[in-house]
């Protein structure tokens, strides 16, 4: 499929469709086909960046798409279903949700199950992830901490196929995500980055964009409700996105992600560029979404204190391996020396 290049304040040019749901494609701008290998037999196992400038980066993207560009766009990085028929959508949802005994069994298990996930750096040839095993329970916030370069962001990208989870397997509701249509998957698994791009236009234009790709227009009341969920004043609807502060832009991006009604939220250091008040606003929004929507959230952070405030489980990733998974209250009892080091420095 053709891609529409966009000029951002980055060295790469992410696809137009990826930006529609706050997702950035891999550095080479492509999404590789999933491995055909099957996931390993699941057995009970362990449940288991450098500082950035505090400046806002806004992509001036027109909110109206010429008709001749609407369908050919590579929508593989967009959460909405795009132009899929109602029949296709229903089939995808049935495939993901499961039915009968299998569906009930999936509902009883973890929301996300990772087994044997390994990834090697193409540039350096070294392993970024080394056989990661991790279970993410339903309706909880899992905080992922670890030193820079330990594979935290790579793990997040594998959970919705921005990086292909191969070798290894990632299961969503018991289903291998490589067997799920990528558009259906990213509609269910939303992702928010440190500095999301804003579309040119108003705040409401940004929030409406994902559903608009599905042919649905959110009402003013729906947009305002989403802004409230993201801890924003609904009166911001008509404000130009170019005039938003960094903290406001981050929360508008959160509302834009929520407009796709995801079941899982992936957050890659969403508060690293924010002031303390904006950070608190984002944290409160995450907790509220867990309580009101039952969202399963996986959040990468360098702040142990932040994870202790909002997470139900902490996953410590060191050199590409999960070395500890435990409740925040038990971090002081962690056996791995890196966990103790993190606590000493927090």
UniProtKB/Swiss-Prot annotation:
Compartment list: Membrane
Record note on disruption phenotype: No visible phenotype under normal growth condition, but strong inhibition of root elongation when grown in the presence of Al or on acidic soil.
Inducers of expression: By Al in roots. Positively regulated by ART1.
GO molecular function: ATP binding; ATP hydrolysis activity; phosphate transmembrane transporter activity; UDP-glucose transmembrane transporter activity
GO cellular component: vesicle membrane
Biological processes per GO annotation: phosphate ion transmembrane transport; response to aluminum ion; UDP-glucose transmembrane transport
Matches recorded under PROSITE patterns: ABC_TRANSPORTER_1, ABC_TRANSPORTER_2
Keywords, alphabetical: ATP-binding, Membrane, Nucleotide-binding, Transport
Tissue specificity note: Expressed in roots.
Family: Belongs to the ABC transporter superfamily. ABCI family.
Protein name: Protein STAR1
Organism: Oryza sativa subsp. japonica
């Amino acid at each position: 499929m053709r891609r529409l290049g966009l000029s951002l304040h980055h060295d790469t040019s992410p696809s137009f469709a990826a930006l529609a749901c706050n997702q950035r494609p891999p550095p080479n701008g492509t999404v590789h086909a999933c491995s055909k290998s099957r996931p390993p037999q699941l057995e009970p196992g362990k449940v288991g960046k450098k500082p950035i400038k505090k400046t806002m980066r806004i992509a001036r993207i027109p909110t109206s798409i010429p008709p001749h560009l609407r369908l050919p766009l590579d929508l593989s990085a967009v959460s909405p279903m795009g132009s899929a028929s109602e029949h296709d959508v229903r089939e995808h949802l049935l495939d993901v949700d499961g039915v009968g005994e299998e569906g009930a069994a999936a509902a009883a298990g973890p929301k996300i199950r990772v087994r044997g996930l390994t990834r090697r750096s193409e540039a350096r040839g070294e392993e970024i992830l080394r056989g990661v095993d991790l279970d993410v329970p339903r309706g909880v916030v899992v905080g992922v901490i670890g030193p820079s370069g330990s594979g935290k962001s790579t793990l997040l990208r594998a959970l919705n196929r921005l990086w292909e989870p191969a070798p290894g397997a990632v299961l969503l509701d018991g289903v291998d995500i490589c067997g799920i249509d990528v558009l259906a998957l990213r509609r269910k698994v939303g992702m928010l980055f440190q500095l999301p791009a804003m579309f040119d236009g108003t705040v409401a234009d940004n929030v409406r964009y994902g559903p608009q790709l599905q042919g649905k227009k959110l009402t003013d009341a729906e947009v305002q409700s989403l802004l409230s969920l993201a801890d924003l004043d609904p009166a911001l609807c008509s404000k130009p996105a170019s005039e938003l502060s960094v903290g406001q832009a981050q929360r508008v991006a959160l509302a834009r992600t929520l407009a796709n009604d995801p079941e899982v939220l992936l957050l890659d250091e969403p508060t690293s560029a924010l002031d303390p008040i904006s950070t608190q606003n984002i944290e409160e929004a995450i907790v509220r979404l867990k309580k009101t929507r039952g969202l399963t959230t996986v959040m990468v952070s360098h702040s142990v204190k932040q994870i202790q405030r909002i997470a139900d489980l902490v996953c410590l990733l060191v050199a590409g391996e999960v070395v500890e998974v435990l409740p925040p209250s038990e971090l002081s009892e962690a056996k791995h020396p890196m966990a103790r080091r993190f606590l000493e420095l927090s």
